[in-house]
Amino acid sequence: MDNEFEMLKAGKLLIASANLLESNFKRTVLLMCEHNDEGSIGFILNKPMEFKVCEAISGFDEIDEPLHMGGPVQVDTVHFLHTRGDVIDDAQEVLPGLFWGGDKEQLSYLINTGVIRPSEVRFFLGYAGWSAGQLKDEFEEGSWYTADASNEQVFTDEYERMWSRTVRSKGGDYCLVANSPELPGMN
């Protein structure tokens, strides 16, 4: 399991290694939306919150889907991933057909008028962020893996199995890691 930092870029999955026990990132799968010399930004895909979007964010009364914890940075900010960069201004393409952000008021209007379906958007509170060099150091410590991302992974609701399935999809020795207990010392 070589250092995979060089393969990391926007549009890739960042997967917490089994050794990463820090509570914010334990067994998480993140979508990286920005990765450059200045730092990195991503969103945790498998940490839904108890709140629904319609309960927590004004203007999105039609979205009866869970709000997600995007990460521990600026948890008072709302972010969204979506598939409708064709109609949302200022959206940044992360993967072919998958976009980050854009005009939130325009998004609200397009959802409320039925142009965009709620299933085409995922909302996050906060984000995961790393300063220049920080994530590279964490890779060297063995804290992270990478994998290719797909729109299906971003919008799945199989949160409980996302980490093990994503690790297992890497094949080889990763299959053993995917089946490891959460607290290996407790065996």
UniProtKB/Swiss-Prot annotation:
Gene3D superfamilies: VC0467-like. InterPro entries: AlgH-like. GO terms for cellular component: cytosol. It holds the Pfam family DUF179. Belongs to the UPF0301 (AlgH) family. This is UPF0301 protein Cpar_0662. It comes from Chlorobaculum parvum (strain DSM 263 / NCIMB 8327) (Chlorobium vibrioforme subsp. thiosulfatophilum). The lineage of its organism: Bacteria, Pseudomonadati, Chlorobiota, Chlorobiia, Chlorobiales.
